[in-house]
Structure formats: C-alpha cells, structure tokens
Amino acid sequence: QDPAPAQVQAEPAAPAVGTVILRADYTGPALPENYTMDQISLGELQTVTPLLGHLRSDYGYRDHPVDGEYKFHNGVDIGGQEGDTIGAFADGTVDYIGKNDTHGLYLQLDHGNGIKSFYAHCSKLCVSKGQLVAAGEKVAEVGSTGVATGPHLHLELKWNGLHLDPAYYVEFLSA
C-alpha cells in the first residue's frame, strides 16, 4: 500500500493593508482626527527596526518634556547616541527632507500602499529627495536637532494619512 501523499500547506497570506489586526482597548481622551490606537496591517511589507534603542516616549497623550503641555505625541522616541545609524523602516522612496524648529532635520519615506515613515531630530540626513532606499539602509544619524531633550529618533508611521502607533511595528531594548 502506497503511503499517503504529503500535505503541502501554503503560508497564510498577510491581512490586506489597512485591515485592523488588533483593536486597542483605549479609554483615554478623544483621539485627534486621523489618529488610531488600533494595530493596522501593513500587508506584505517587510520591515526592520530603524534604531534599536530604549523607548523614551510612547505614542499618545503625554506631558511634553520641554513645554510641559499635555498633548498628543505623534510617534515614539527611541533613545540613541549622537551619530548612531538610523535605517529605513522598509524599502521605499525618499518623499521629502527638511529642517524646522520643531523637528530639526527630518525626512519621510514612502513605502507604497499609503504607508509612510517619518524620522526627526536627526544630526545628519544621508539621503536625497526621490532616492530609492532598501529596508535597513542608512538614511540618517541620531541627533537632538529641533525641540529635543537629548539624542533620539522620533519615529512616526502613517497609512493613508492615519497616524499609527509605531510600537506595534518596531522593537525596543528592554529597560
């Protein structure tokens, strides 16, 4: 008697981009427009942690460390040393680069499917507008430009303009 043929199981596909994969149990103040505490699927996007460091400030409402005002923090702050490498969150194109009083030196990457990552307080930008970058490729260096209490990466993630909590998608060093 012949043995039964081996069963081949396909890898399950990632949920479609934009699918809610974790509904947050959030009971705090009303969120600003275009912000969510839910985890949203990024589909098949292959991602990396741009800077492995300690989480210095969460996404969400907080007392601002400089002005003391209670307001929403659009991203996460990841601690690092001045000049540490910041890698691209995923393959993408440099959407824009710039400098202002709040964010200091900053850049945004477009990863397609409405997914964008934003990096602020950099000491140096290592890319130019329109440049293609690979996941993990050096795009900037950690700094404390703009309104900052010390060297760190301020990282924001968006899907079709909806701000996401980056902590769902990156790793941190434990305390």
Language-model segments: which ranges?
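Glycine-centered loop/turn positions within well-structured domains
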Residues: 76, 84, 117, 125, ...
